[in-house]
């Protein structure tokens, strides 16, 4: 169906923290700087990385005192390299009585997620519904490996729940 095809057959839709709701293509055109037709499906970037990366490409300094979460991936955007993230990515998709959940129950994710290296943990802030995926091996999020990696679940849930508590206002 169109519903599943629009997210490249990944699990999830908008309003979900599964890959189908958060993974997006990014196109960039910069004639004479970037060779046309290049594709990079390996590097993991986030919107917060755009400001420091585009400033570096433009040859300008970030705003004085800037302490954002983004990393400079100018070489990745220019097609000169591929990069592994050095820091974790975290998401909170707030839930309340007004929130519209995805219609398909399989697309309804917990409201917190953290991506750390190849691991992606989804969990609710009360510790319920922990799901762990090795995104490099399972980008469709079909094989929850939380039971076989309790140490990873404990480490990542502590990080993302702490982040949520510090940033929920």
Residue ranges, per PLM feature:
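C-terminal cap/loop subdomain of S1 sulfatases and analogous C-terminal strand-loop tails that border
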Residues: 1-17, 34-43, 48-135, 166-167
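Ligand-binding/active-site lining segments
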Residues: 20
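Short glycine- and hydrophobic/aromatic-rich loop-to-beta-strand nucleating segment
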Residues: 26-28
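Intrinsically disordered, low-complexity polar regions and short flexible loop motifs
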Residues: 138
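Active-site-proximal N-terminal segment of extracellular/periplasmic enzymes that hydrolyze or transfer
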Residues: 143-151
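Charge-dense polyanion-binding interfaces
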Residues: 155-169
């Amino acid at each position: 169906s169109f519903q599943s095809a629009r997210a490249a057959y990944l699990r999830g839709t908008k309003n979900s923290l599964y890959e189908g709701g958060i993974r997006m293509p990014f196109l960039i055109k910069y004639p004479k700087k970037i060779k046309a037709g290049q594709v990079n499906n390996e590097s993991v970037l986030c919107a917060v990385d755009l400001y420091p990366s585009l400033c570096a490409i433009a040859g300008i300094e970030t705003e004085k005192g800037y302490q954002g979460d983004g990393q400079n991936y100018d070489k990745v955007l220019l097609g000169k390299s591929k990069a592994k993230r050095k820091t974790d990515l975290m998401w909170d998709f707030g839930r309340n009585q007004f929130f519209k959940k995805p219609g398909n129950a399989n697309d309804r994710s917990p409201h917190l997620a953290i991506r750390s290296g190849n691991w992606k943990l989804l969990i609710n802030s009360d510790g319920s519904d922990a799901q762990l995926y090795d995104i490099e091996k399972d980008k469709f999020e079909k094989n929850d490996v939380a039971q076989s990696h309790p140490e990873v679940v404990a480490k990542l849930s502590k990080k993302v729940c702490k982040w949520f508590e510090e940033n929920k206002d």
